[in-house]
């Protein structure tokens, strides 16, 4: 049975916007989600275009958090930890919040986080983002 999944993508700079990286992040994540036997409804693709990763007040992220809290999302795909947040404390907060609500967070460009060593690597990447 296919798992319900969502995608979160973010860019903050004009250069990133010009390079169309939010679309490329989304396309890569959609492709990856299909390999993990997940279905991503179109309205479960959350994007924050032009928002800094150093703040939590982002419209796409807020809608995503609401949906995760309602228990609908089983898997969340994000390109890399720094796309979720540029602050380590916020990354930990969000990852724990999603996990507590039953959503697995999968980063395309990072260690999987399935064991203590991989979780430590994700945390380390968050500290230097």
For the regions a protein language model found, what residue spans apply to each?
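Short, structured surface patches at the beginning of a domain
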Residues: 1-129
């Amino acid at each position: 049975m296919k798992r319900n999944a969502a995608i979160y993508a973010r860019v903050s700079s004009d250069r990133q916007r010009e390079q169309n990286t939010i679309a490329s992040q989304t396309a890569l994540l959609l492709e990856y989600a299909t390999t993990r036997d997940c279905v991503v409804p179109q309205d479960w693709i959350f994007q924050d275009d032009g928002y800094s990763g150093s703040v939590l007040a982002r419209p796409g992220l807020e809608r995503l958090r609401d949906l995760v809290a309602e228990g609908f999302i089983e898997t969340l795909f994000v390109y890399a930890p720094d796309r979720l947040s540029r602050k380590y404390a916020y990354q930990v907060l969000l990852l724990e919040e999603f996990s507590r609500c039953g959503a697995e967070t999968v980063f395309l460009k990072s260690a999987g986080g399935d064991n203590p060593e991989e979780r430590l690597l994700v945390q380390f990447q968050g500290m230097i983002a």
